Amino acid sequence: MSNTRINTLIIFIFTLTTTGFAMAYEEPKYNIVKTYQEFEIRKYDDRLAVEIEYSNEDSGFRYLFKYIAGANTNSDKIKMTVPVTQSVKIDMTTPVTQSVKNGKMLMQFFLPSKFTLENAPQPTDKRVSLVVIKGGHYAVIKYSGRLTNQNYLKHYKKLENNLNNNEIDFIKPGIRATYNGPFTLPFLRRNEIMMKITFDEENNN
C-alpha cells in the first residue's frame, strides 16, 4: 500500500471519530519491565481486537471503521482506541522474504477494555473478525515524524539491530502502531514499532 493511501486512510478515520485533537483515547494497558537506551520492553495482557486481512492493493481500513461505526450485530457505535496497528501475515511454509513480499497485511483496531469476546458485538461483514491478541513481551521503539515507509524501515532496522546486539530473540514481522490524528505536527507524533520477543524477566533485571 502506498504512503499516500496510508496517510489518506489515517486522515479518514481520525477526522470522522474526533471533534478535537487533544482528545484522550484508551490504549491497551502494559507494564514496562526494562528500559534500554533506544527501546523498551513491555508486558501486555490479552487484548481484544477487530481485525481484517487484506492485500497490499486493497486496504481493509474502511471495513474496520464501519464495524466501530455500527456495522455490527448490535448496531453499536464503539469508541475509538489507539493504536491502530498493521503487520504482515507470515506464511510459515514459505521463506520469510517471499511471504513478506507476497503476503497479506493485517490491520487491527483494539476494542475498549469493557468488551470481552463474549459481549462484544459481532461484525456483520464476514471479512472482519474479532480476535484475542495473546499477551506477552514486546520490544518497542518510539519515533516521531511522518508516517512513511522510509521512516518505518529506518526505525525497524534500528530495533532489529538493538535486539540482536542484546541477544534478545524476536519474532518477525514488526508491528506498526499509529497513535495520532492527521493534523498532529510531525515532531509531536507518537509512532511505534513493536516486536514480539522471548524474554525472561527474572534473569534480565
Positions of the model-derived regions?
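A solvent-exposed interaction/effector surface
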Residues: 2-6, 12-205
